[in-house]
Amino acid sequence: MDVRALPPGYTEWPAPPVLRDAVACLWAQVTSESGSRTGLVLPDGCTDLVWEQGRGAFVAGPDTGPVATTMAAGTVVLGVRFRPSAGGPALGIPLSELRDQRADLAELRPAQARQLAAALDPDVAAAQMLDATAALVADGAPDPAVTWAARLLRDPAARAEDVAAEVGLSLRQLRRRCQAVVGYGPKTLQRVLRFRGFISRVDARPEILDLAAIAAEAGYADQAHLTRECGRLSGMTPATLARQRAA
């Protein structure tokens, strides 16, 4: 990926095949030379390794609410988004310690941080991000039980007790594993995944905003349930969030 050729805005692309078990996607956020940008990061159940031009590398832990961001004009931010079951093993720490936190990579993995600290050019940083990610994943592969559990929890009707039994763990064991590997327990992960399902449906049909129908499709009990959860996870009403994403 030629980072310098990317247009202003947010872009995602697939990770190399060797990393796809652990990495959901690679991404970049670019601002134009003429204007800064403010944004809002919403929970997705993932942890990201991030390189920001002028700052260096840091880790964005799993969020449980919206996080406001600001980028100066002419800035590039690069990211590696770990799958829910991969962040904790790759970083070698319980991700519950990074829930709703941002931490310099130097505090967690000094060797990879030193490598990225020397990168001033975004294209060089992009290549070094992949090298650093490969080293992290080699040290800690995704947790197979949590990988399986996360797939099952995409079903809004799934019960945590049944998911635990399906993956061969007690409910207490599943909670502990999810806290360490994902950053929060299975019920919170399920809430976040259901919310992302709502967002995906809104993005797919921006011209049709039938919130009651979308709420039912995404697994919410009713539109009021969607409104409560959207407020907790995004700080907005569903209609406001949908309008913002369509803009």
Whereabouts are the PLM-identified features?
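Alpha-helical bundle regulatory/interaction domains
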Residues: 1-171, 181-186, 200-221, 237-247
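DNA major-groove recognition helix of helix-turn-helix
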Residues: 178, 190, 229-231, 242
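Alpha-helix termini
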Residues: 105, 196, 225, 232-235
